[in-house]
């Protein structure tokens, strides 16, 4: 008995240049390969300066007196490596800020990264926007520990917002979608759209907390170490 056709009906894997398609028990999971710009360092490695590919991308610096200006071609933001491979992206950084070994990677069009001033250190954090029209909005006085990631943007028009005076510990992961797309085998409609994440003011996220799509964390909340939050958090 040839069981290969039977196994293929249960599970199969197809690779193309841009996607991997997994068929499993009637579900069709389509995973888009990320188009990461060629670089001599991995994303998690800090490289001083910035690199931009694409059209109409802007990096705006807001000075302490409120005036705004574009980042100069030879200017660096201490502690923050910016890499953009997209069009119409907007980065707004209000001074003062204290980045250390951080990376901002934008890989799709019409994305926004907006961070207010902070007197605390933002350390070892990756901010990664990889789908169109997505946003990361951060209020005043954020602090983060090493290994924190705000990424997983595979759905369009998804926003992660973090309020004022928030403290994020080590190894925290904030993901507004699943990182891949699942389609209905009958209708071909997407089954797992991303959802916004909203973190209020005066929030403390403990070590290795995971915040997933649709999470809402109200003001004045502490989330204990290694907790998983997937919906509106009830303090």
Each model region followed by its residue ranges:
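Short, surface-exposed beta-strand/loop "edge" segments at domain boundaries and coil↔beta transitions
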Residues: 23, 27-31, 68-71, 90-92, ...
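Flexible, glycine/small-residue-enriched loop-and-beta-strand segment within the central core
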Residues: 89-215
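C-terminal/domain-terminus segments
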Residues: 217-235
């Amino acid at each position: 008995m040839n069981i290969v056709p039977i196994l293929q009906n249960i599970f199969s894997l197809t690779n193309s240049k841009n996607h991997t398609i997994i068929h499993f028990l009637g579900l069709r999971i389509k995973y888009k390969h990320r188009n990461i710009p060629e670089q001599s360092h991995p994303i998690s490695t800090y490289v001083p300066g910035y690199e931009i590919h694409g059209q109409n991308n802007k990096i705006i610096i807001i000075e302490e007196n409120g005036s705004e200006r574009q980042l100069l071609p030879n200017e660096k933001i201490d502690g923050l490596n910016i890499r953009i491979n997209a069009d119409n992206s907007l980065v707004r950084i209000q001074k003062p800020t204290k980045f250390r070994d951080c990376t901002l990677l934008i890989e799709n069009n019409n994305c926004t990264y907006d961070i207010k001033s902070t007197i605390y250190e933002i350390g070892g954090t990756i901010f990664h926007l990889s789908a169109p029209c997505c946003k990361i909005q951060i209020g005043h006085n954020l602090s983060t520990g090493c290994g924190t990631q705000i990424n997983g943007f595979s759905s369009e028009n998804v926003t992660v917002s973090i309020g004022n005076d928030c403290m994020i510990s080590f190894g925290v992961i904030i993901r507004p979608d699943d990182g891949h797309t699942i389609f209905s085998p009958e209708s071909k409609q997407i089954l797992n759209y991303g959802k916004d994440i909203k973190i209020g003011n005066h929030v403390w996220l403990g070590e290795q907390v995971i915040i997933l799509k649709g999470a809402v964390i109200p003001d004045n909340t502490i989330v204990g170490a290694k907790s998983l939050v997937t919906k509106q958090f009830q303090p």
